[in-house]
Regions:
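Membrane-interface "cap" regions at the ends of multi-pass membrane proteins
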Residues: 1-48, 53-58, 82, 93, ...
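Cytosolic C-terminal regulatory domains/tails of membrane transporters and channels
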Residues: 1-21, 492-682, 704-709
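Extracellular loop-to-transmembrane helix junctions
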Residues: 51-102, 107-114, 127-154, 269-270
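Loop-to-transmembrane helix boundary motifs in multi-pass membrane proteins
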Residues: 107-110, 147-152, 250-273, 355-392, ...
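Helix-loop-helix junctions that connect adjacent transmembrane segments
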Residues: 178, 182-239, 464, 468, ...
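Hydrophobic alpha-helical segments and their helix-loop junctions in multi-pass secondary transporters
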Residues: 181-211, 278-287, 414-431, 486-495
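Extracellular/periplasmic helix-exit of transmembrane alpha-helices
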Residues: 191-202, 263-314
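C-terminal membrane-solvent junction of multi-pass transporters and transport-like membrane proteins
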Residues: 366-378, 413-458, 463-466, 497, ...
Length: 709
């Protein structure tokens, strides 16, 4: 790693951690709750408002249905929590819904679940941050005026926090999450005390407004459809529940028990806050409208485009605490902050799921590799990029983004619970112990009811939200599914192609002879080292090769070659069009054609430099040549490095990075146990791959040439 990128990376992300410190990043329950459950906990900041927005289509009279919708959401939440408690005990490895569906329903069902969850994680980041920006914008106008920019900045900051490691980010996120939860409970209790004990009349700032209903007097099927749509909007309170089942490996031992306890606590807190806010909204007469400028009426007139519609939780807090009071400001700040931090659920769930998918060869294997801070860095960056793109496309508008929401999570809910039913059926078929059978039958009953209820809700969500944006989420799921299927086919095809055969084939037969070719442009120390290394290989044939792009330089090279008496034949390739790469490629192919059973070893001298700008000052055409040679069967490419004096600076930087636990420290071992590097360049040649990334290479005959390949 270069000095230019190393120092900023260490400042932003921190020192690299050794693999044996992975246990130090595992989470206790008090930290796991805000890390994994911040999404469903924070959803009470916008889920009640989404319910009222849908009901407002039928006017204020439809608001009396909101408590019943809240009851339906509570029943659904408790059902899902009870179902997932069975999941974390049966599958503690962290695969969550993906592992359950794959094991019990097959690979296609598993991929469907994975696609749904990946889309939902991206939407979690986009929705949470967009909603947080809008809440913050009610106090700071600049934020609303630059929503997309501010949302993107928050995504970048969250990404950096998570790249430092889940435990550190969890500690930071715990404080505002607990302040938010505590503030909401204080608001609910104080509001209940004022209303029930003191008899105070609490009124929201919109209590005197009227709503211009789009459809008056809805009844029959139209009313049922409206209520179902409002219920599906309220189901946003359930998003993120599955993150705990995906993140079981991140918990401290006993992992399953701690995850199940955290899941139960999350469900209880979320439904209590959701119901409390719905009840206070009804008590304080909160009014919401999808188009407030035209649908909210004050004294019989539209309120106008200058009106900013505050979220339900903000209006309730103003009615309970009083506008501008300390508790009002504290809750408003905590609400905005916790909405930003709710995205952290996805920052933990997405990389973990991506790692499992990569291990199963459905995603690039780089997603399975942990970064310097023992986090799945590639998955974190991928999630951030996708969420930022979605935020820009939708203008950081939470109302539009929420229409895409929750489709994926209910797909995973339904398939996961269906898979758990099959899981218990399989175990009941072989289990003889009556106590264990009773426990399994109870778990099966819970998962059966969960599968039925979540499947029913999925149908409701698809029917009521398809034209409002759910089709975009479905399209994203299809794209993920097709991409992962193609990646798996590619990995399977490559594995089959490179598998070691039982019988010897041409690739395994020892070559009859090895013909070595040393590429040179002039006689200097790197050339002499490459020739010495080639002689050590004891090849059956050895020659030096140069390309004649400048007759004067070629003649000078021949003369010095003869004067020095170098005992290696010099082959000169003519190049009328001053090309370097093509003549060499054609010559090497000719050697292979003459003797197909022979192997050709192409040896290239290489400069090792210490500064990035030195790469620009040396001829790079040999690097292109090496890249072309990789596609020539039977040709081996070897780089012989020669360390220039400036490479000592790079060695000094490497020694300093050892004290910083630089990247690669995990593979090299503790800094104190690593062997000292020699202060002088090694006299022996080293071989490297054809990529030539360790330095600059000189192409044969290219010195001083401006010709293009």
């Amino acid at each position: 790693m270069s000095k230019l990128t190393d120092v900023p990376k260490r400042i932003l992300i921190g020192r690299a951690l050794r693999s044996d410190r992975l246990g130090e990043t595992l989470l206790p329950k008090r930290i796991a709750l805000p890390v994994f459950a911040s999404d469903p906990l924070s959803s009470v900041a916008y889920a009640p408002g989404e319910v009222l927005l849908v009901l407002s289509i039928a006017g204020v009279s439809a608001y009396h249905f909101s408590p019943w919708i809240a009851v339906a959401v509570v029943v659904l939440m408790f059902t899902v929590v009870a179902s997932y408690r069975q999941n974390v005990h049966a599958y503690p490895s962290g695969g969550g819904d993906y592992e359950v569906a794959t094991t019990n329903l097959g690979p296609k069902a598993g991929l469907t679940v994975a696609s749904a969850l990946l889309v939902d994680y991206v939407l979690t980041v986009a929705v949470s941050i967009a909603s947080g920006i809008e809440n913050l914008g009610s106090a700071i106008p600049f934020v609303v005026e630059h929503k997309v920019l501010c949302a993107t900045v928050v995504i970048v900051l969250l990404t950096l926090m998570n790249l430092r490691g889940v435990k550190e980010s969890g500690k930071l996120f715990a404080i505002p999450t607990y302040v938010f939860v505590g503030g909401v409970f204080v608001m609910i209790l104080w509001g209940a005390f004022r209303g029930l004990v003191l008899g105070d009349t609490m009124r929201a700032p919109t209590a005197d407004f009227h709503i211009r209903a789009e459809h008056q007097g809805l009844a029959g099927f139209a009313l049922v459809f409206l209520l179902l749509r409002a219920f599906s909007s309220g189901c946003a309170a359930l998003t993120g529940v599955e993150a705990i089942s995906n993140g079981v490996p991140a918990f401290r031992k006993p992992k399953s028990k701690n995850a199940a306890s955290t899941l139960a606590a999350m469900g209880l807190l979320a439904v209590t806050m959701f119901c409390g806010i719905i009840a206070l909204a009804a008590t304080t007469k909160v009014r919401m409208a999808e188009n407030p400028a035209t649908d909210l009426l004050h004294n019989g007139h539209p309120i106008g485009s200058g009106y900013v519609q505050n979220p339900v939780i903000s209006q309730v807090a103003e009615a309970v605490f009083g506008k501008g009071s300390f508790l009002f400001v504290l809750l408003a700040a905590a609400t905005a902050l916790v909405l930003f931090l709710a995205a952290n659920t996805a920052y933990n769930g997405f990389p973990l799921l991506g790692s499992i998918l990569a291990q199963d060869r459905y995603l690039p294997r780089q997603l399975h590799t942990r970064g310097d801070r023992l986090a799945f860095s590639n998955g974190i960056v991928l999630l951030a990029g996708a969420a930022a793109l979605l935020t820009v496309i939708y203008g950081a508008d939470s109302t539009r983004l929420i229409q895409l929401y929750i489709v994926g999570v209910f797909v995973s809910f339904t398939l996961s619970q269906t898979g758990m039913v099959r899981h218990w059926n399989r175990h009941l078929a072989v289990e003889k112990d009556q106590a264990k059978r009773r426990h399994m039958m109870r778990s099966r009953a819970i998962n059966t009811f969960g599968a039925f209820l979540t499947g029913l809700v999925l149908v409701v969500v698809l029917v009521t939200k398809f034209t409002h944006g759910a089709w975009v989420a479905l399209l994203g799921m299809c794209i993920f599914f097709a991409t992962m299927t193609a990646i798996r086919k590619h990995y399977d095809r490559v594995a089959e192609e490179i598998a070691a055969p039982e019988e010897p084939d041409d690739d395994l037969v020892r070559p009859s002879r090895v013909h070595s070719v040393v590429l040179i442009s002039k006689i200097h120390r790197p050339t002499l080292r490459a020739l010495a290394y080639a002689k050590l290989m004891r090849s059956d044939g050895l020659e030096a090769l140069t390309v004649n792009v400048d007759p004067a330089e070629t003649k000078a090279l021949r003369d010095e070659w003869e004067r020095r008496g170098i005992d290696v034949p010099l082959k000169v390739l003519d190049s009328p069009y001053r090309e370097v790469t093509r003549p060499v490629i054609e010559y090497v192919k000719g050697l292979r054609k003459e003797s197909p059973r022979d192997a050709v070893s192409v040896i290239i001298p290489e400069y090792v430099v210490g500064h990035w700008y030195e790469h620009l000052l040396h001829n790079q055409s040999a690097l292109r040549l090496k890249g072309r040679l990789l596609f020539t069967p039977g040709v081996m490419v070897t780089s012989v490095p020669y360390q220039l004096a400036s490479s000592e600076a790079a060695k000094m930087r490497a020694r300093r990075r050892q004290e910083w636990s630089a990247p690669g420290a995990v593979r090299r071992g503790p800094a104190g146990e690593r062997p000292k590097e020699p202060s002088e360049p090694s006299g022996s040649a080293g071989a490297s791959g054809a990529s030539g990334t360790s330095g600059s290479s000189e192409a044969p005959g290219s010195s001083g040439s401006s010709a293009k390949d």
